[in-house]
From Swiss-Prot:
Presence of the UniProt keyword Hydrolase in the record: no
Membrane topology, record value: Single-pass type IV membrane protein
Signal peptide: none
One Gene Ontology cellular component: plasma membrane
Chain segments annotated as transmembrane: 271-291
Domain t-SNARE coiled-coil homology residues, every copy: 196-258
Consequence of gene loss (knockout): Leads to defects in secretion of degradative enzymes and defects in hyphal extension. Also leads to the Spitzenkoerper dissipation and accumulation of secretory vesicles.
Region (Disordered): 1-31
Repeat as UniProt keyword: no
Lineage: Eukaryota, Fungi, Dikarya, Ascomycota, Saccharomycotina
Similarity comment: Belongs to the syntaxin family.
Gene name of the encoded protein: SSO2
Protein's name in the database: Protein transport protein SSO2
Organism: Candida albicans (strain SC5314 / ATCC MYA-2876) (Yeast)
Compartment annotation: Membrane
Single Gene Ontology BP annotation: vesicle docking
């Protein structure tokens, strides 16, 4: 029996490298440059995780197909294969949560930094994650439909005259009533029980697939909503900039008024000085003429 994670690292090998020199050459101060390098390192790590996530999706797809198409309850490896798939699905769920949080963090950093390069890289990660979530949903949807078809065919082996309503109740709802009726009406109860057990196993697998699809749908919605959430800080920054600009303009206006007032006050002082000087001169002339005539 092989180890389900044997050579798993080979499955997760990186097919792409994300080099920092692929980004625009911009001038940064020493502290900003360190911040930019840290940000791009985080982007690189996220892309590596996205590679891993893609590989896990492919593994889940292949193993689900093999398990559901070749289901044999008499095979001692059946439980092992089912557990292997369950482990991969759990690993994908854990990775999804980590990716969601990390992508949200880099988008928040990018928005607050107002660095378009950071914004573009964070958005690229988000869109790539959305594409992979959609791929995973399609994988589960295909396997779900395939499982339903196989379960329906198996049920019709022991009850060829089963109606569509009955098949749906057995395959999708796991109706025990129809199971018991089919067993009672079958001439080969041993074979019928074996087939019905397989149908029940496929029904349980259907429930797992539907649960995963529901979780992926919610995750896809959350990642789409992330863009709307990130718009709010941008609007706040723009409003703050607008307010600051308005305050500056008001300050300049007040300053201009103060300058004009100061100039006006100086002019008034000069006029007062000249008027006083003129009065003194006139008085001096009058007094000089008066005392001159008396002599």
């Amino acid at each position: 029996m092989s180890n389900p994670y044997q050579n798993s690292q080979n499955g997760y090998q990186q097919n792409n490298s994300y080099e920092l020199n692929n980004y625009p050459n911009k001038q940064y101060s020493s502290s900003n440059e360190d911040d930019f390098v840290q940000f791009m390192n985080e982007i690189q790590d996220i892309n590596s995780q996205l590679d891993n996530y893609s590989n896990i999706i492919n593994l889940i797809d292949n193993k689900q197909k093999n398990f559901l198409h070749g289901l044999d309850l008499n095979d001692e490896d059946t439980d092992y294969d089912s557990k292997q798939i369950e482990n991969l699905v759990n690993e994908a769920q854990s990775l999804q949560l980590d990716l969601k949080n990390r992508i949200k963090n880099v988008q928040t950093q990018a928005v607050h930094s107002r660095d378009q390069t950071k914004v573009d890289q964070a958005e690229t990660c988000r869109k790539r994650f959305l594409d992979l979530i959609q791929d995973y949903r399609l994988v589960e949807a295909r396997n779900k439909e395939s499982t339903k078809e196989q379960a329906a065919r198996q049920y019709q082996i022991i009850k060829p005259d089963a109606t569509d309503e009955e098949i749906k109740a057995v395959v999708e709802d796991g109706s025990q009533q129809y199971f018991q009726q089919a067993l009672m009406q079958s001439n080969r109860r041993g074979e019928a029980r074996s087939v019905l057990n397989e149908v029940q196993v496929r029904h349980r697998e259907l429930l797992k697939l539907e649960k995963t699809m529901a979780e992926l749908t919610q995750l896809f919605h959350d990642m789409e909503e992330l863009v709307i959430e990130q718009d709010q800080p941008i609007q706040q920054i723009e409003e703050q900039v607008g307010t600051a600009q308005h305050d500056i303009e008001q300050g300049v206006g007040h300053t201009n008024k103060a300058v004009k007032s100061a100039k006006s006050a100086r002019k008034k002082k000069l006029w007062c000085f000249f008027i006083c000087l003129l009065i003194v001169i006139i008085l001096a002339v009058i007094l000089g003429a008066y005392f001159g005539t008396r002599k």
